[in-house]
Amino acid sequence: MDKFQSYLGLDRSQQHYFLYPLIFQEYIYVLAHDHGLNRSILLENAGYDNKSSLLIVKRLITRMYQQNHLILSVNDSKQTPFLGHNKNFYLQVMSEVSSIIMEIPLSLRLISSLEKKGVVKSDNLRSIHSIFSFLEDNFLHLNYVLDIPIPYPAHLEILVQALRYWIKDASSLHLLRFFLHECHNWDSLITSNSKKASSSFSKRNHRLFFFLYTSHVCEYESGFIFLRNQSSHLRSTSSGALLERIYFYGKLEHLAEVFARAFQANLWLFKDPFMHYVRYQGKSILASKGTFLLMNKWKYYFVNFWKSYFYLWSEPGRIYINQLSNHSLDFLGYRSSVRLKPSMVRSQMLENAFLINNAIKKFDTIVPIMPLIGSLAKSKFCNTLGHPIGKVIWANLSDSDIIDRFGRIYRNLSHYHSGSSKKKSLYRVKYILRLSCARTLARKHKSTVRAFLKRFGSELLEEFFTEEEQVFSLTFPKVSSISRRLSRRRIWYLDIICINDLANHE
């Protein structure tokens, strides 16, 4: 961000940002490309390498200066005479760069707010595993959970209106409207519950799509923080740090001023100091220690709140109230639940002995094996029944590359699923990947799997050791039982910031 600010000469104290002229500057395209934000966008057309990509940008800007209707006009033909490129290519270039430009004031306000509030930025909060450690610490004391799909705006114009709080440049907002209406399937962008939400527009314009989604989530979650602070005697102090990635510092004060009078008389019905919120992959969880009646009140209160004040559409029938003691949460590759673990205690008083049954709540996380096998089958490591098959397209690689690829895939999966309470699923994955690796190598050398395993079995075994197993074996070389017991423990890593494609069953 400092690199952006030095190029653009923007001062954090400025109240208005005129971003539209930056679209006509060559260096903003080069900076975005070099910064790694979208390295492939200018190079996707065949026949153009790194040296000629800047030429495309220069001629694009020249055309924008010279023509009134530009190359992005709806009346343009799909194929432009200029360099033989079609309109969609230039639309893609400009939409990606425009999204980068519009992120500048948001990022600057975020950094300024962090410094003003003295919030220490922690990368550990970005870890996916931090969600599960949070659930492990808090869900044992809760009773009910609301499964809430994130509501979507009734019209795309609402997304643009939400950005007016951050972006004061009207021209940039008009350009954003143009990109949204230019999309042929733009209605699917706002329906987050649809499998087709990643339409042709979102596939070609990932950064703009995520920018709009982030601003939408910002608007949606700011209401949660306000209601949480208003309904509890203990004000939330850590919410700002936990939500630092979605850019709504300063929004809380604005909401407090606007909505305080409207809700002050009603929120006494919802006093609940034990409300916890988690968001993941277009869905969210709201857990509470309250009763079923209280959760039902929250459910309809949120539906009317989103509809009346944010113009967000949510279907009450898709919001489910579940009791944690008999409900499992399936998300991010884990199946999480709170189970009652029976415990028997023997108590003796004088000559009489008593057996007392106690039920202890335990947070349990397992890896569902069938969705994981489905992901492996989709990637051609096994069939739908879980029987390993060779990876034919890797047969032309060297032996070391093949073994390294299979070993790395297993280590990544094992690292991500290290928080599982039961490791049986991971042993099944190791078996599938090891045998798939052996079949691939046997096919390459025109040999049988049995003969190949007999020759290279020990080498394959070493490649499929995880980091934890290596550490345990080095620490306890002679005590194998301790090593096995430690390797079965649940471990959460705070360096995992993205979900593995094979682990993502959504």
Swiss-Prot record:
Q: What is its main location?
A: plastid
InterPro entries on file: Domain_X, Maturase_MatK, Maturase_MatK_N
Q: List the protein's name.
A: Maturase K
Question: GO terms for CC?
Answer: chloroplast
Where in the cell is the protein located?
A: Plastid, Chloroplast
- Origin species: Jurinea cyanoides
In terms of superkingdom, the source organism counts as: Eukaryota
Q: Which UniProt keywords apply?
A: Chloroplast, mRNA processing, Plastid, RNA-binding, tRNA processing
GO molecular function term, any single one: RNA binding
Its biological function?
Answer: Usually encoded in the trnK tRNA gene intron. Probably assists in splicing its own and other chloroplast group II introns.
BP terms from Gene Ontology: mRNA processing; RNA splicing; tRNA processing
KW Transport (keyword) present: no
Q: Does the keyword Lipid metabolism apply?
A: no
Q: What family is this protein classified in?
A: Belongs to the intron maturase 2 family. MatK subfamily.
